[in-house]
Amino acid sequence: MACLERIAAENPRINALITVAREEALAQAVVLDAEARAGRFRSPLHGIPIALKDAIDTAGTPTTAGSALFESRVPAEDAHVVRRLRRAGAVILAKSNLSEFSLTATNATSHFGAVRNPWALDRVSGGSSGGSAAAVATRMCFGALGTDSGGSVRLPSAWCGVVGLKPTDGLVSNSGIIPSVAILDTCGPIARSVEDVAMLFGQMVGYDAMDIRSIDRPAEDYASSARQPVARLRIGIPRKGYFDDLDPQTARCVEEALRVIGKLAGGVKDVTVPPVMEFLDAFVNAAEIYSYHEKMLQRQADADRYMPGTRKVLQWCVGYLEDAAGGTAAGKLARYIQAVARLESHRRTIDAAFTDFDVLALPTLKGSPPTLAEALQVEGADEAKVLVPIDNTLLFNVLGLPAVTVPCGFSSQGWPVGLMIGGPRFSEGRLLALASAYEQSTEWHERVPARAK
């Protein structure tokens, strides 16, 4: 299998993969090859090797969340989305590296070591699904799955020069996935092209009665949707707030991309979108994170095993919850219920905002990837403020909306830049169509890191 050769060549220097299921993958490939010779093809993913972020449960294969606490954790069952992929004939090749418990944005805080950016080894890949994006960029796998609670699929995809999709909340089941911020979490595909993302995504979507947030909708052929015309799409540009403080190199690439998609579609216009924190009370984030880690934090032997950057995030959560609700259990509960109610109200009404435009287009990130040294100096809760501002990506998690990032250029130093296209709920087909039209009008997605050619 060619991907195993790529892993042997690339993973020692990139550190994108934690576990390589070599024997299991080869056994799967033998079965699938026999089916293909007999004329049976399960789906477009038949025999295709993919990697899974190591927060997604795989039966009999360790799922560690990038943490020493879960180093020996071996699930008995596959996550719902993994079962769907296996039925579709995908070969589960490897488990990818991630920020510990998906809680930081650089991928420098993994128990298994930092993921390096394949375009510049002294730079971060972005996180928390950095291993998935780096593995795809270096051709260790056809595609990969990540999870996204604030940008964790799109952020590393942008900085690694690949395509990443954050779906509408509820289209892909979260059953069997270790949570980061459960109310914001989604599982999404990463691949080399929009077409590949569409094919992978089509096999991931499906109702799961075991996931309270799962949505039962008619199946859609996303690969076909990605080929639909885009000439009438109206593109909104939320410049105020979401284009502030752009790195000049990022601004150059994004503005040129907007010029291209404006010609492909029905034009662009500036629109106003409120700041993301008008929709989200940070108390929700703190409460969701702390609720998963509470018992481990109460056991000192476990608490001491967290990575320093993760520990800072958890300490911030504890302090914020105490300060924001006066320290009483009743106060915390009331604050959480009120904050979630406001969030759900915003989510129910947000589709009405898409009346004067069909999609939003904006920078995925506002600057270039920091160095690993910088990331290790500023770990934890300060990352989002100092190194990796995530307001642009977080907007779509908070509102439960889909968004896709596509490569739109390179800085003068050679680092990839991403353009993000987002829309109302269940508009994945529309977003993929515009992203595909843009991709076919440019050549950015064809570029690969030097050693991956």
Model-predicted regions and their roles:
Residues 69-74, 185-192, 314-328, 421-422:
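Short, well-ordered beta-strand elements within core beta-sheets of diverse protein domains
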Residues 30, 221, 246-272, 293-304, ...:
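Acyltransferase
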Residues 68, 72, 213-214, 281, ...:
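Short, surface-exposed loop/helix-turn segments at secondary-structure junctions
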Residues 9, 13, 87, 137-244, ...:
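Structural helix-boundary/capping segments
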Residues 62, 395-397:
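Conserved short alpha-helical elements in the N-terminal third of ANL/AMP-binding
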